[in-house]
């Protein structure tokens, strides 16, 4: 029997505490057959829909895939407004948020440094992209991370996840939630990797 790894860390975004918990519930075996399928095996758009579901379950509202203005930097270093796509705008307890979402697939190894660097780069990129959005609310970068474990490292799976999640807990100024189920952790791809669970990272752009 594997060990379950499951935690939420709201950090400074206390309003999202319930959203994180509801999101974890949507990852559980009640909704998915892990032997053949799991939500974290899908793309950013599909995962964003489950995040929206968690918001609605938390008595909030969500508006996805909308056209919006976005700022970009010209070669001359000036800011120029153009049209773009917003991933999700949502509200909780009279506070509004507008976000940029990304997805990444870090490789888990005996040492977690490289996987954590992949996550750090991804959330920083999402946070930077969020800075281009209009001030419809607090601007957030969101990352859905689906870690993958090579079949050669399967005997050390729990040990590797222990090290990885310990590193997650040390990430600064980042709202986090993760779920690696204990049962039926057998989602194996044809690429020689296992996909044991998912991490959600959220970081606010405060500029």
Model-predicted segments: where are they?
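Conserved catalytic cores of phosphodiester-cleaving nucleases, focusing on short active-site segments
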Residues: 87-109
């Amino acid at each position: 029997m594997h060990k379950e790894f499951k935690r939420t860390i709201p950090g400074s975004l206390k309003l999202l505490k319930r959203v994180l918990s509801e999101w974890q519930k949507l990852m559980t075996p009640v909704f998915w057959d892990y032997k053949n399928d799991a939500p974290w095996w899908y793309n950013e758009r599909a995962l964003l829909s489950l995040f929206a579901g968690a918001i609605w379950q938390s008595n909030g509202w969500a508006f996805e895939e909308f056209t919006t203005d976005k700022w970009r930097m010209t070669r001359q270093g000036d800011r120029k407004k153009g049209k773009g796509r917003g991933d999700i705008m949502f509200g909780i307890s009279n506070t509004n948020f507008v976000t940029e979402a990304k997805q990444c697939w870090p490789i888990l190894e005996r040492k977690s440094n490289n996987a954590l660097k992949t996550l750090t780069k991804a959330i920083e990129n999402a946070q930077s992209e969020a800075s281009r959005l209009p001030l419809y609310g607090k601007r957030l970068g969101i990352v859905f991370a689906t870690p993958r474990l090579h079949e050669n490292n399967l005997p050390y799976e729990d040990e590797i996840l222990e090290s990885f999640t310990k590193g997650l807990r040390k990430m600064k100024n980042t709202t986090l939630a993760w779920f690696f189920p204990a049962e039926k952790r057998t989602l194996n791809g044809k690429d020689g990797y296992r996909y044991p669970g998912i991490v959600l990272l959220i970081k606010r752009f405060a500029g």
